[in-house]
Protein backbone atom coordinates (compact mmCIF):
# COMPACT_ATOMS: atom_id res chain seq x y z
CA UNK A 1 0.00 0.00 0.00
CA UNK A 2 2.87 2.39 0.74
CA UNK A 3 4.61 1.65 -2.55
CA UNK A 4 1.90 3.46 -4.54
CA UNK A 5 2.75 6.73 -2.82
CA UNK A 6 6.51 6.23 -2.71
CA UNK A 7 7.36 5.17 -6.25
CA UNK A 8 10.08 7.81 -6.42
CA UNK A 9 11.77 6.24 -3.36
CA UNK A 10 12.60 2.92 -5.03
CA UNK A 11 16.27 2.00 -5.29
CA UNK A 12 18.39 -0.65 -7.04
CA UNK A 13 21.60 -1.86 -5.39
CA UNK A 14 24.86 -1.06 -7.19
CA UNK A 15 27.26 -3.80 -6.04
CA UNK A 16 30.38 -1.80 -6.91
CA UNK A 17 29.60 1.23 -4.75
CA UNK A 18 27.26 -0.52 -2.26
CA UNK A 19 24.79 2.30 -2.76
CA UNK A 20 21.32 2.33 -4.23
CA UNK A 21 20.50 4.05 -7.50
CA UNK A 22 17.26 5.90 -6.99
CA UNK A 23 14.84 7.96 -9.00
CA UNK A 24 16.22 10.65 -11.31
CA UNK A 25 19.85 9.70 -10.68
CA UNK A 26 19.80 9.99 -6.88
CA UNK A 27 22.25 7.75 -5.04
CA UNK A 28 21.60 6.79 -1.43
CA UNK A 29 22.71 4.29 1.20
CA UNK A 30 20.52 2.57 3.72
CA UNK A 31 20.56 4.10 7.18
CA UNK A 32 23.16 2.15 9.24
CA UNK A 33 20.57 1.35 11.93
CA UNK A 34 18.25 -0.31 9.40
CA UNK A 35 17.87 -4.08 9.65
CA UNK A 36 18.36 -4.26 5.86
CA UNK A 37 21.66 -2.32 5.91
CA UNK A 38 23.74 -5.49 6.27
CA UNK A 39 21.50 -7.71 4.11
CA UNK A 40 21.59 -5.37 1.10
CA UNK A 41 18.56 -6.55 -0.91
CA UNK A 42 18.60 -5.80 -4.65
CA UNK A 43 15.51 -3.58 -4.60
CA UNK A 44 14.29 -1.43 -1.72
CA UNK A 45 11.68 1.21 -1.04
CA UNK A 46 12.45 3.82 1.59
CA UNK A 47 9.94 5.99 3.40
CA UNK A 48 12.24 9.01 3.60
CA UNK A 49 15.50 10.26 2.17
CA UNK A 50 17.58 12.26 4.66
CA UNK A 51 20.65 14.22 3.62
CA UNK A 52 23.39 14.63 6.23
CA UNK A 53 26.99 13.86 5.28
CA UNK A 54 25.45 11.80 2.47
CA UNK A 55 21.98 10.80 1.30
CA UNK A 56 20.46 8.14 3.56
CA UNK A 57 17.33 6.07 3.02
CA UNK A 58 15.42 5.46 6.23
CA UNK A 59 12.57 3.09 7.06
CA UNK A 60 13.40 0.66 4.27
CA UNK A 61 11.59 -2.39 2.94
CA UNK A 62 12.68 -5.06 0.49
CA UNK A 63 10.46 -5.08 -2.63
CA UNK A 64 9.97 -7.16 -5.72
CA UNK A 65 10.51 -5.05 -8.88
CA UNK A 66 7.34 -6.58 -10.36
CA UNK A 67 5.36 -4.83 -7.62
CA UNK A 68 6.77 -1.45 -8.63
CA UNK A 69 6.12 -2.20 -12.31
CA UNK A 70 2.50 -3.08 -11.61
CA UNK A 71 1.84 -0.26 -9.15
CA UNK A 72 3.60 2.36 -11.26
CA UNK A 73 2.27 1.17 -14.62
CA UNK A 74 1.18 4.74 -15.41
CA UNK A 75 4.72 6.17 -14.97
CA UNK A 76 7.06 3.37 -16.09
CA UNK A 77 8.90 3.78 -19.36
CA UNK A 78 9.20 0.83 -21.71
CA UNK A 79 11.78 0.65 -24.47
CA UNK A 80 12.04 -2.11 -27.04
CA UNK A 81 15.03 -3.20 -29.05
CA UNK A 82 16.31 -5.96 -31.33
CA UNK A 83 13.13 -7.21 -32.98
CA UNK A 84 13.72 -10.73 -34.27
CA UNK A 85 11.97 -13.90 -35.38
CA UNK A 86 11.66 -16.71 -32.85
CA UNK A 87 11.07 -20.04 -34.55
CA UNK A 88 10.45 -21.67 -31.16
CA UNK A 89 7.55 -19.30 -30.44
CA UNK A 90 6.65 -18.85 -34.11
CA UNK A 91 6.40 -15.11 -33.57
CA UNK A 92 8.25 -11.83 -33.92
CA UNK A 93 9.83 -10.96 -30.57
CA UNK A 94 11.71 -8.00 -29.10
CA UNK A 95 13.71 -7.21 -25.96
CA UNK A 96 11.97 -4.94 -23.47
CA UNK A 97 13.55 -2.71 -20.82
CA UNK A 98 11.29 -1.24 -18.12
CA UNK A 99 12.42 1.73 -16.02
CA UNK A 100 10.73 3.67 -13.23
CA UNK A 101 12.07 7.24 -13.01
CA UNK A 102 15.38 5.93 -14.39
CA UNK A 103 15.60 2.89 -12.10
CA UNK A 104 15.71 -0.29 -14.20
CA UNK A 105 12.99 -2.71 -13.10
CA UNK A 106 13.33 -5.17 -15.99
CA UNK A 107 16.58 -5.28 -17.94
CA UNK A 108 15.97 -7.75 -20.76
CA UNK A 109 12.51 -9.29 -21.05
CA UNK A 110 11.53 -10.95 -24.32
CA UNK A 111 8.04 -9.87 -25.41
CA UNK A 112 5.85 -10.33 -28.46
CA UNK A 113 6.58 -7.63 -31.02
CA UNK A 114 3.09 -7.77 -32.55
CA UNK A 115 1.61 -5.61 -29.76
CA UNK A 116 4.34 -3.00 -30.12
CA UNK A 117 4.63 -2.56 -33.88
CA UNK A 118 2.19 -4.80 -35.79
CA UNK A 119 3.38 -3.73 -39.25
CA UNK A 120 7.05 -4.43 -38.53
CA UNK A 121 6.11 -7.72 -36.83
CA UNK A 122 4.19 -8.73 -39.96
CA UNK A 123 7.22 -7.92 -42.13
CA UNK A 124 9.45 -10.03 -39.86
CA UNK A 125 6.94 -12.89 -40.07
CA UNK A 126 6.73 -12.70 -43.86
CA UNK A 127 10.48 -12.60 -44.34
CA UNK A 128 11.50 -15.26 -41.83
CA UNK A 129 8.55 -17.62 -41.70
CA UNK A 130 7.06 -17.58 -45.18
CA UNK A 131 9.97 -16.64 -47.43
CA UNK A 132 12.90 -18.25 -45.59
CA UNK A 133 10.72 -21.16 -44.41
CA UNK A 134 11.61 -20.93 -40.71
CA UNK A 135 8.15 -21.93 -39.52
CA UNK A 136 6.84 -25.25 -38.26
CA UNK A 137 3.18 -25.38 -39.17
CA UNK A 138 0.52 -27.69 -40.50
CA UNK A 139 -1.02 -25.17 -42.89
CA UNK A 140 -1.46 -26.73 -46.32
CA UNK A 141 -0.70 -23.54 -48.25
CA UNK A 142 2.73 -23.30 -46.63
CA UNK A 143 3.61 -26.92 -47.36
CA UNK A 144 2.35 -26.59 -50.95
CA UNK A 145 4.28 -23.35 -51.53
CA UNK A 146 7.51 -24.89 -50.16
CA UNK A 147 7.04 -27.92 -52.44
CA UNK A 148 6.46 -25.67 -55.46
CA UNK A 149 9.60 -23.66 -54.68
CA UNK A 150 11.61 -26.89 -54.37
CA UNK A 151 10.30 -28.12 -57.74
CA UNK A 152 11.15 -24.79 -59.39
CA UNK A 153 14.67 -24.84 -57.93
CA UNK A 154 15.12 -28.37 -59.25
CA UNK A 155 13.83 -27.33 -62.68
CA UNK A 156 16.19 -24.33 -62.70
CA UNK A 157 19.10 -26.66 -61.96
CA UNK A 158 18.11 -29.05 -64.76
CA UNK A 159 17.58 -26.35 -67.40
CA UNK A 160 20.44 -24.16 -66.13
CA UNK A 161 18.18 -21.14 -66.03
CA UNK A 162 17.83 -18.75 -63.12
CA UNK A 163 14.65 -16.93 -64.13
CA UNK A 164 11.94 -19.44 -63.24
CA UNK A 165 11.74 -18.78 -59.51
CA UNK A 166 10.74 -15.29 -58.44
CA UNK A 167 12.97 -13.24 -56.14
CA UNK A 168 12.49 -12.93 -52.40
CA UNK A 169 11.26 -9.36 -52.90
CA UNK A 170 8.53 -10.55 -55.26
CA UNK A 171 7.52 -13.27 -52.79
CA UNK A 172 7.38 -10.65 -50.04
CA UNK A 173 5.07 -8.47 -52.12
CA UNK A 174 2.94 -11.52 -53.00
CA UNK A 175 2.33 -12.38 -49.35
Q: What residues fall within each predicted segment?
A:
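Extended, charged helical/alpha-beta scaffold domains that provide interaction surfaces
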Residues: 1-175
Amino acid sequence: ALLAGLLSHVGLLDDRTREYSGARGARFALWPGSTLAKKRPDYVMVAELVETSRLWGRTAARIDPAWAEETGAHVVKRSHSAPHWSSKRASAMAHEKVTLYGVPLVADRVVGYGRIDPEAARDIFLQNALIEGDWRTRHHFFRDNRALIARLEELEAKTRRRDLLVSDEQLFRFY
